[in-house]
Amino acid sequence: MSNPQDQLSNDLANASISGDQSKQPQQQQPQQQQPYFNPNQAQAFVPTGGYQQFQPQQQQQYGGYQQNYTQYQAGGYQQNYNNRGGYQQNYNNRGGYQQNYNNRGGYQQQQQQQYQAYNPNQQYGGYQAYNPQQQQQQQTQSQGMSLADFQKQKAEQQASLNKPAVKKTLKLASSSGIKLANATKKVDTAKPAASKEASPAPKDEEASAEPEAKKESTPVPASSSPAPAAADSTPAPVKKESTPTPSVASKSAPVSASASVVTADALAKEQEDEVDEEVVKDMFGGKDHVSIIFMGHVDAGKSTMGGNILYLTGSVDKRTVEKYEREAKDAGRQGWYLSWVMDTNKEERNDGKTIEVGKAYFETDKRRYTILDAPGHKMYVSEMIGGASQADVGILVISARKGEYETGFEKGGQTREHALLAKTQGVNKIIVVVNKMDDPTVNWSKERYQECTTKLGVFLKGIGYNKDDIINMPVSGYTGAGLKDRVNPKDCPWYEGPSLLEYLDNMDTMNRKINGPFMMPVSGKMKDLGTVVEGKIESGHVKKGTNLILMPNKTPVEVLTIYNETEQEADTAFSGEQVRLKIKGVEEEDLQPGYVLTSPKNPVKTVTKFEAQIAIVELKSILSNGFSCVMHLHTAIEEVKFVELKHKLEKGTNRKSKKPPAFAKKGMKIIAILEVSEPVCAETYKDYPQLGRFTLRDQGTTIAIGKITKLL
């Protein structure tokens, strides 16, 4: 008696054989028309490889193709297949319908026998799914054949393609979203991402210009099929199969191959430089980025104000602030807890003064901000200059408390010097925030507020600020009054202006050179599984994988990773943003602050000698040829020597003297030639203000400010 388990397995085996046989006629049905195709071979072919698994998939869809073919005349052909992910996409993702069969050999005959009264003049969509008739030549060319047949057919098609070439390129242009004859295929291959970004914008224009193309593409969802199909499918076959490679090349330029390649390269470069505003909006919801620097005399309340803004905008949560409050109380520094949000190191917390330039990030409904918290002590002015060189807007914090304002503003205080340095470093808008208005010695007094702002206003106008660029407002950094919400009218009935964040949100937008050549002065460096540099992008934009040059050493580097203000990875960063870039090609010890990352096409200049216009603001004695001091130029700090005093400029008219002056003293404006010992990255002030303005310091004092007029 046979085992019931053996009986069961036999039954199952018989069932699977009969099942296979019942499927087999269905699969082989279309092939019976071909007398030279041997079904037995296919049967023998089944066990050897994975082709059997592939066959049912392909043939079922092929079978479905015949069923749905009748709908092709009704205009529903493309729709049916796009609902399955697109007829052409399915096959392209497998390396192409024709190519799969080519590689297996012998299946191309099956294709050349046109499927049951299928009209050979109407190829089914091809790669683009835009113009079935125009793709006829491309389809037949891609089919498997010997090299000799291929070359013969290529020659025939080139002759036949000469006439309709113009029509073809125009049609293709609409699918790739680029209006350039003969270059469309090249650009798709070279820049798939660019074609995706560019495709939405021109669609509307071309829809009205080409009604035919519009009709054909109506059944196809615009976003899903044309552009991505080209972008996704083009790279795959080029790498895997050898047959289509020459066909793509021959199709791209039937009229003049060399002209086409040149224009395609030019277009690719153009596209690389153009940044679609829509991309910026997509990434940041249309919010632009502003860097603000808190400056002013030591103890004016800069860090406390910065910490409170972070708390009020939700960038620091309540638990963290409460933790700092407990720690500050334990350390006997009860009123300092908000400043601890900004002052993170132990020395800063113990002394209650900022040493480094603190950085923090917050966001409002309208903008993204980076706070640069500059040290107020005169020992750390160099750090403050580095911070000011990266800022868009200066917030000059002054204390209204009796005695503190006077200390900061009088000689030796940092209020004046910080305002001057900010102006020198290109901070053209300054917000004077009168802090500590809630102090018992002040108690929101209008008289005290006016006393502080009037004196300072005269000084600010004297160093070059326009009246419209100076804004005054009373606040309390500790209680938060006037920072996010307006000051309570009960406390301060005489001030009806905006709060600090309200004003910042509604300022005019910054003029960013997003499409300019990329430039980023390096303000800091670190080692973190590679070389990381940080700084503010002064011009242009950068993407992951971009090749740049590090000047002045001319070292080629590649951008591996971009970290934005919130320490998150980003694909792109734009002019005005504070970023950290992980770069390949240079060791951390081989670079220093003051180096500039720049675009290879338009690198920043490097010089050891330049001519500059200089205003001497504070000098104990005089200076003459050979005088040396320290120059702060963007993020670079270099020793500089006066080689030649060329002209003295008259007050008021700025007319040059004919004779060179023998010396220069406080209050004079001169034109001089300066020299540095090592090459430094610089541009003229006229071309790139941020890389063309500098500050001169000697013995801990700012002695002069200047701008580069000529590179020598």
Curated annotation (Swiss-Prot):
GO cellular component, one term: cytoplasm
GO biological process: nuclear-transcribed mRNA catabolic process, deadenylation-dependent decay
Modification sites for Phosphothreonine: T370
Chief location bin: cytoplasm
UniProt region (G3), positions on chain: 373-376
Composition skew (Polar residues), residue ranges: 1-23
Residue ranges of the region described as G1: 296-303
Extent of Basic and acidic residues compositional bias: 202-217
Region called G5, residue ranges: 476-478
Region named G4: 435-438
tr-type G domain span: 287-512
CDD domains in the record: EF1_alpha, eRF3_C_III, eRF3_II
Subcellular location: Cytoplasm
Annotated Low complexity bias: 24-35, 48-64, 132-141, 190-201, 218-256
Any one GO MF annotation of this record: GTP binding
The protein, known as: Eukaryotic peptide chain release factor GTP-binding subunit
Species per Swiss-Prot/TrEMBL record: Candida maltosa (Yeast)
